[in-house]
From Swiss-Prot:
CDD domains: A_NRPS_SidN3_like. Residues 559-635 form the Carrier domain. The modification O-(pantetheine 4'-phosphoryl)serine is found at S596. Disruption phenotype: Abolishes the production of aculenes A and B and accumulates aculenes C and D. Keywords: Ligase, Phosphopantetheine, Phosphoprotein. Residues 699-1013 are annotated as: Condensation. This is Nonribosomal peptide synthetase aneB. Belongs to the NRP synthetase family. Pfam families: AMP-binding (PF00501), PP-binding (PF00550). It is an enzyme of class 6 (ligase).
Length: 1078
């Protein structure tokens, strides 16, 4: 590598506030900050920061004094940064959410003069100050109280002076702070601006945590280049990023790939440029974003202002590991073993960087500086020798022919988790200290970042146990000691103690006891062998280390002991898609990933084998060992009860004879009486989606557009559809109105198979128009080469059955037989309520004492127009913690509704799958079983989130045997029940059923005609297949949006409460709002 092809970029000798001041002069009235708590022009930001700089000078902030900034994400952060710079001080960020002990250590390590804070963080700032520091200063009070001091001389600060300190994780147990000068920061910003598509038109999202050096780069990119810094509210930033981007009209943002993967590119039309960085980029990231935005990349540690290399355009590279060329530094590749030797050209080695944007070293840490920085190494040409240090990145890379860098990983124990750089040594230091309190001396500890059995990258701590034999077997199986009875309690204690010193992302998820730590030939800890041996453990051994204390204990020795337990183990494994050895007799259902829908599948499988078990049984008895004590076993196969045609409506129609009913139905359908095979009364599903359209114009029609494989035979597909229709009586149902003794009633008529596929039809349907009418088929299917379009009324399907219809269609297309589908057993089960006085009593008691207040309030003149809605999207992440996903969602929604409407007694319409009904084969039958039923969540504000979620889970289990009721029957039970039935909130928690669709039909899109619901608020949570995350859809009627305020933050509040349930479940409900700052 020659000097000509590895030049050092020129230094730009300016201060941060000097460059900012030029933007003030050039465009004073342009937007500088657009934040949730206010906007500032460049002139206003200049004035406020000058006022604060004057105040800080009077408090002794000048000549390099260190000032800690402790803020929420708000406009005041920009004011504070610029003010400290103008005053001549040096600032550094504190992340208020981190442990106070860690923040205090940071302040002491740099001998901070004072803490400058927002009003909301004054209590944290007070805990950090000591006798050596000035009293904390609240920025809002200081700026609003003081007079404008007038112009200040900005030339007193030299560009060579320090501007800020960037803290990163340190291997000695404390964070280390890299000192960055004004000219280093300015040089990095200005040299890297063009390749990152940055200019004064940029509206930049301030997203990064203050623990991440990108947070202050986001400020620089906007304020030094004349753009606008866009700062969302804290809850929106964390939980509703898509809404934040659109509401602030963000067109440029930096994200880690992990965060970017949570977003939906089509939902961000304002976004022009996305820059990825902080962790490795994958080809999947490129595939996801390149069709929608200009995608660039930024690579580099905090020790290099604004990074080392920029990938200007990912659409032009062959590998996602190509991080681009350097723009603000010169790069050298040295030997991985010896930094005094250059690596051969084109070889992989450690990356060393040289140039004006490199930090000055670590503040008050000369030993760490010496290890990480080089001064005039022998391979550096004499012409380049200076007092400026070179930085050893610890990253392995090689230089391509075009000057780009190809990233090859790390050479040390520094890792990144979710974009956050951590030193494993810092975790080891604090873990040793915590374990030392329990042992005679601190044991050896090794922390590793690993992906184990599909878990996300996480930190695991291995520690050597004293007093055990350290002789290891050949394959290392005996290296790891199995968990004992106190394992879970110790793990939770260690984690609790570490939270006083480390942020959450650095807390180990498990602490693995080992007989001894493997060593290399040179006597160092053999980390590679340790990782490999652990990953090779049997699955039941590994899972035993990740118990979360959810009401049971996973036993590595607890294999089934009886024939029934072994039979149940096979059923659990098949249902949860686990290996037999992964399911022990003492493993709790939920700890294995079991949820309510999976429980329904288990019930169906068990019935086929003669085991009578219910969904409540599974959740209440938790483990195979206890469950098998409460189930009954019957000999012989399960039989399906049959019902003669027309028998299910005769009791409703009184003295009207069968033939009279057939003739009435046939006349409305335009068929002969012989074509009417049966008549069914409405179930709860049909009652909810057929009767309302006559009065409010919601037709509940789904449009499913399928992209068919080019080679598919349309004639064969049409024949297959005829077979499916013939086998499935549900698809042949039509709505008819029949005479009763004193009135008319609407029922469903099952007709002969006369619903063929048709050529692709032109669709010209106005919103709110009834597409079907009495006596007409309720499904239409049109086909053309490469495309199938289905229109189907909700009376014929639910979220579970639709995929099963296409499963049957694929089987018929391939010449396989299609099982006949009878709806009568389910209809009979749902109509048994006529004589169920004890069941009706359950519903009376459920709503006893309800005061009639529904939320949002019911719209009096509910017509088609007022049902137009606003649509918002969000996302959730879940962790195994002993709570069902459904109850987390339900309680979180109830909590947020209680904040908006000042009531803890919430009624809503829940969509219930009802696949736990005692009907053979119900899980695999393509019949519409679900129902919208009124439900009630009574929050106890004095109790913890945990107690409220536990109560909700029990309420759901108690309700399951009573789900067969129809909404009209609830209305007649009591005045309170009638009032609750006027609910205006709908909640649907839906499993991702995409895997049910055969491959030939999997490429499809769904949509609805007209308004989706007649209710004011509808929330749908679409769970991922592993139930570890969910996409959230929130629809609000226009009338509700107009009459009620603060809906823009509703979804963010909801997501924050779900997080709180998982992270801090002991918080009382009545203290949660203050805790979240909502």
């Amino acid at each position: 590598m020659t000097l000509d092809d590895n030049p050092v970029p020129p230094t730009l000798p300016y201060t941060l506030h000097g460059v900012f001041q030029q933007n003030v002069l050039d465009r004073p009235d342009a937007s500088a900050v657009c934040a949730w708590d206010g906007d500032l022009t460049y002139r206003e930001l200049d004035e406020k920061s000058s006022t604060l700089a004057h105040i800080l000078r009077h408090r002794g902030v000048q000549d390099g004094a260190l000032v800690a900034l402790c803020f929420d994400h708000s406009l005041w952060t920009a004011v504070a940064m610029m003010a400290v710079s103008k005053a001549g001080g040096v600032w550094f960020f504190l992340e208020p959410k981190h442990p106070v002990n860690r923040l205090r250590q940071m302040c002491r390590s740099v001998q901070a003069r004072m803490v400058l804070c927002s009003r909301s963080q004054a209590s944290v700032a007070a805990e950090l100050s000591d006798d050596q520091m000035e009293a904390p200063l609240s920025i809002e009070e200081a700026v609003l109280r003081e007079e404008d001091p007038g112009p200040m001389d900005l030339e007193v600060v030299s560009p060579e002076r320090p501007a800020y300190v960037a803290f990163t994780s340190g291997s000695t147990g404390s964070p280390k702070g890299a000192v960055m000068t004004h000219q280093a920061a300015v040089t990095g910003v200005l040299h890297n601006a063009k390749p990152m598509q940055l200019d004064r038109t940029a509206r930049i999202l301030q997203f990064a945590s203050f623990a991440f050096d990108i947070s202050f780069l986001e400020h620089f990119w906007a304020l030094l280049l004349g753009g606008c810094l866009c700062i969302p509210a804290p809850l929106d930033r964390q939980n509703n990023t898509i809404h934040a981007v659109q509401s602030l009209q963000v067109n440029w943002m930096f994200l880690t790939p992990t965060v970017a993967r949570l977003l939906e590119p089509p939902q961000l039309p304002s976004l022009r440029t996305l820059v990825l960085g902080g962790e490795p980029v994958t080809q999947a990231d490129l595939d996801m974003w390149l069709p929608y935005v200009h995608l660039a990349g930024l690579y580099g540690p905090a020790e290099c202002a604004v990074g080392i290399a920029v990938q200007p355009d990912y659409s032009r590279v062959e590998s996602a590991n190509n991080v681009g060329p350097p723009f603000s530094v010169a790069c050298w590749i040295v030997s991985e073993q010896d930094p005094t030797q250059l690596a051969p050209r084109g070889a992989v080695g450690e990356l060393v960087v040289e140039g004006p944007s490199i930090s000055e070293g670590y503040i008050n840490a000369p030993e760490q500086t010496t290890r990480a920085y080089l001064t005039n190494p022998t391979w550096l040409p004499a012409a380049r020798h200076s007092t400026k240090k070179l930085y050893r990145t610890g990253d392995l890379a090689r230089v391509l022919d075009d000057g780009s860098l190809l990233f090859h990983g790390r050479k040390d124990t520094q890792v990144k988790i979710n974009g956050q750089r951590i030193e494993l040594g810092e975790i080891e230091y604090h873990t040793r200290a915590v374990l030392g309190k329990e042992h005679l001396r601190s044991p050896p500890v090794v922390a590793e970042a690993m992906e184990v059995r599909g878990r996300a990258l996480t930190v695991i701590a291995f520690y050597q146990v004293e007093g055990v034999c350290q002789d290891l077997d050949h394959d290392g199986q005996d290296l790891f000691l199995p968990p004992d009875d106190g394992f879970v309690g110790r793990k939770q204690s260690y984690q609790s103690q570490l939270r006083d010193h480390l942020p959450e992302y650095m807390i180990p998820t498990s602490f693995i006891p080992v007989r001894g730590l493997p060593l290399t030939m040179s006597g160092k800890t053999d980390r590679k062998t340790l990782r490999e041996k652990f990953a090779q453990l049997p699955s039941d051994r590994i899972k035993a280390y990740f118990v979360d204390g959810d009401g049971g204990s996973r036993s590595t020795e607890g294999m089934p002991t009886t024939p029934l337990e072994r039979q149940m183990q096979e059923l659990w494994a098949a249902t949860l898609k686990l290996e037999l050895e992964e399911v022990g007799r003492n493993d709790p259902w939920m700890s294995l990933g079991g949820e309510s829908l999976a429980a329904m599948r288990l019930v169906a499988r068990a019935r086929k084998e003669g085991i009578a078990v219910t969904v409540p049984d599974i959740f209440r008895h938790k483990t195979i060992a206890t469950l098998c004590q409460h189930v009954s076993v019957r000999p012989g196969p399960e039989t399906i009860e049959s019902f003669p045609p027309f028998s299910l409506v005769q009791c409703q129609q009184g003295s009207t004879g069968i033939e009279e009913l057939r003739h009435a139905a046939a006349q409305q359908c335009g068929l002969t009486p012989e074509a009417i095979e049966d008549l069914y009364p409405f179930t709860a599903m049909q009652e909810a989606v057929v009767i309302p359209p006559a009065t409010i114009g919601v037709n509940y029609t789904l449009r499913l557009d399928v992209k068919l494989p080019a080679e598919l035979d349309l004639e064969q597909l049409m024949r297959a559809w005829d077979m499916v229709v013939a086998a499935n009586s549900v698809l042949r149902m039509r709505v008819v109105r029949l005479p009763a003794d004193e009135s008319e009633t609407m029922v469903l008529a099952v007709t002969r198979p006369e619903i063929p596929m048709e050529p692709l039809f032109a669709e010209r349907f106005a919103p709110g128009v009834d597409l079907w009418g009495l006596g007409k088929p309720l499904v239409r299917v049109g086909v053309a080469p490469g495309r199938l379009v289905m229109l189907i009324q909700h009376a014929l399907y639910d979220g579970h059955s639709l995929g099963l219809i296409f499963r049957d269609l694929e089987q018929a297309y391939r010449g396989q037989p299609v099982a006949a589908v009878s709806y009568s057993p389910f209809v009979h089960w749902s109509t048994e309520w006529q004589d169920g006085s004890n069941k009706q009593q359950y519903w009376r008691e459920k709503f006893a004492g309800f005061d009639g207040r529904v939320c949002p309030p019911r719209v009096a003149d509910a017509g088609i127009g007022c049902m137009e809605s606003q649509h918002f999207w969000g996302s959730l992440n879940f962790r195994p913690d002993g709570f069902t996903v459904t109850s987390k969602i339900r309680v979180a929604l109830a909590v947020v509704l209680s904040w908006h409407f000042d009531t803890c007694d919430i009624v809503l319409g829940g969509i219930y799958a009802r696949r736990g009904a005692p009907i053979p084969g119900i899980m695999e039958s393509p019949v519409p079983a679900s129902a919208i039923l009124p439900d009630r969540i009574r929050l106890d504000p004095t109790q913890s989130l945990r107690a409220n979620v536990d109560q909700d889970q029990e309420n759901i289990l108690t309700m399951m045997p009573y789900e067969g009721i129809r909404p009209s029957q609830v209305l007649d039970l009591s005045e309170a029940a009638r009032a609750a039935s006027q609910f205006q909130t709908i909640l649907a928690v839906q499993q991702d059923n995409s895997s049910v669709y055969p491959e030939m039909f999997r490429d499809h899109e769904m949509g609805y005609y007209g308004p989706v619901t007649a209710h004011n608020l509808m929330m749908q949570c679409f769970l991922s297949p592993d139930r570890a995350s969910a996409r959230v859809s929130l629809r609000l009627s226009e009338r509700t949006m107009q009459e009620t305020t603060a809906w823009d933050r509703f979804l963010a509040h909801f997501e924050a409460v779900v997080d709180a349930i998982q992270e801090k479940p002991e918080i009382p409900v009545d203290r949660l709002r203050q805790h979240l700052g909502a």
